[in-house]
Amino acid sequence: WRQFTYNQGQSGRGVFAGGFSNPLYHSIISYIQIPTTGNALNFGDLTTNAGFAPAVSNGVRAVWGSRYTGSGNNTMDYVTIPSQGNAIDFGNSTGSLWSRGGFSSSTRGIFFGGNPTSNVIEYIEIATIGDALDFGDIMSSRRDAAGLASATRGILSGGQPGIGANYTRIESITIASKGNSIRFGESTMGSMAMAGASNSTRGIFAGGTTVPTLDGNNTIEFVTISSEGNAVDFGDLTQKTYRFNAMSTGTRVVFAHGTTGPSGTGLLNTMDYINISSQGNATDFGDKIFAYGEYSGSGTSDSHGGLGGF
């Protein structure tokens, strides 16, 4: 077994970045303090205006992966979470994909899937600036899947194959060992563009949408990360939303809402939260700096479940 130690420097800060409000993509990075309620504050800017840039963190550094800037862009950039400021170039992704999912441990960041529809898994060593490397493949190509992790296992759920119905399959990988994903269980939702977050034992997936209507949903479900099996209903978000993100500590998940349906006709500035250990509906947390969407998976924190010890 492996022992994990909580780092008192981890304050519960969540960061999220990029997004779209007609007619522009944005570079804004926002931050919140997850243990308290309140509105998001300005942190700095990404190196590009972007949407759909997945985020990973080792507790000190947050890295955003390849993104959409009007076309696919393989840029990755990073910030130091305790220090406000603009992002710095980290390296390049293996491809110019967007609408990817991501999760991380205390050392390694994982990005998977993407648009154009892809089955690629790639990884970075978060503490070391450089380009992403091939990790393996997910079971089938998909975009707009959501991810979360414990210190050892990464979980991905949902997504859309490009044409046809959304996926209900949940898959997992062992973060420290390169290789392909394996089947974990089934989602209750079968949604794309969900948000995912976790503590060290319980994973939360929420929201999302289905084709062809692109009408958001408000469902929250959970999995026990160490035990393969199907997701279980947890409760409901305060609003139907998709293409949004989630940030967590060991006790709480905050959702920063994105788009509401049908067909992306509304952009939200709201945030809500749940207590991970207690099933139930979400409660209002505060507001984003302004209303925008199309930033699936772009949130992470200095205290998420992939860091262990919570």
Regions flagged by a language model, labelled:
Residues W1-F310:
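Polar, enzyme-active/binding microenvironments
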